[in-house]
């Protein structure tokens, strides 16, 4: 076999690489500026943190502090999302991840990122990891685009050495939905699935020129057929939306330009389609028509959730709000939006497409308003003439709402005839990698074996007016992990925590553990309750979670599966005797690894300079 001569491809194809030259002084100047740019921020942060006397986290030192408590927390959070992780002690990978997360949380990062994003969006018309900037001022949620272009729900992604071995465990949509359908069927309940087409499916012309609507994933139709084959009453809205789109006047649209969601008019039309499907059921005539309503047309403004993903501070200064004429649905008896009714034969499960125009925190709300009452749930209840049992969670349409329904009580579930499950179609179409990036998790749910009291007259109450029905002291046993609030499509979130009961001060409670939901973050900022750690003893003033209107529909980070009554904490706080006293923590403790590292760097520099000096002295003079 003859030897092949290696050839330069540039010479072979007649291409000639460009030669760039620069003076020594220029190179030194640019090198120094570059080094200063990348070293000044971390140096300032390390110096600033090193000067603290009450609490201290110095990155350059903590990098060598392995293992530590934060590494344990990082491993615990990973294990909750993947049963494949068997190790009991944190590895170096856990440590590096924990350090990286703490560095990202640096205070100066926020202002730098904010200014950079402002320049990137205004000058280069680019978004970020969550937002894609389209044409004519339209913004698109990136996971919605990923749901149309990835492997999809039917073909598993190939494994790869480039994937994080500790990534959240992915469960395919079909087996999870099939099991949930079977669980409902065993209880005599029918499932109606309403996948809501996301904005790029219906308005792709604003994403890029030349794309025709409707835009579908290649496996979407096959997926829907498989779901129908399970006995699911699947409502495909695509054709209806395209018909309505054809009748639009110039300047009108079915979705909001700067928001993920549909317009109020589109929502009302979809509610009418779903209501007609429900009314066609043979048992609908026997449903108690127990809801009389009055309506109120108002105009509301909202800048859009995707604008909030691009800029956290004062989005209204640089972006124009969109105006919507909405119709509030109010219970004639109470003057408030229709309350969720545990005794209803119809349950509605949904994500933010159900919450928009109802939950003030995700748009179109007024200061001090706890519920708008113009969303999908209120509109559907009006059309059906009956109260619904409603479970919603922003970003939690795949698992959280099913889990909440399954845990609502054995007698509550068995009373149902129909579950209407409204979910963004992207969650049905995402494959593993984009699904994990979007925080979408598909999990099986366990149905509660407890019976609960069902109120005769459903009435929602506001948390500020509620008096605690149970006051106890609990020791935190386990808690759910929270996503980065800067990377989520929702601005607020609760999280679940499991407490061992130490003492009951008020009320009766027979269980040894309590499942409590606390605030995780508000306005995309972590709050004091987020800092509770396993082992903390906490005094809790509790009310049943379903009674609290102010948290209805808000995302709930919940990766605990305990068949217990769910409470909301009105006033959580560490017991006085367990609060750590403020004290000076003493001088810095320098890890040995850091000392050896510095010695090695200094030795390397000295040896390098010595070699260079000797070579210059030995070089012959021309």
Name these PLM-found stretches:
Residues 477-486:
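Short amphipathic, basic-aromatic surface patches that mediate peripheral association
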Residues 616-622:
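Short, charged juxtamembrane terminal tails flanking transmembrane helices
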Residues 469-471, 509-514, 602, 606:
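Short, mixed charged/polar active-site loops
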Residues 589-612:
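Selective detector of the "anchor" transmembrane alpha-helix that sits immediately C-terminal
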Residues 2-473, 488, 492, 502, ...:
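Extracellular glycan-modifying ectodomains
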Residues 493-577:
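Disulfide-stabilized netrin-like
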Residues 576-593:
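Short, aromatic-rich amphipathic segments at membrane interfaces
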Residues 61-64, 585-590, 613:
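Short, aromatic- and cysteine-enriched interfacial helices/patches
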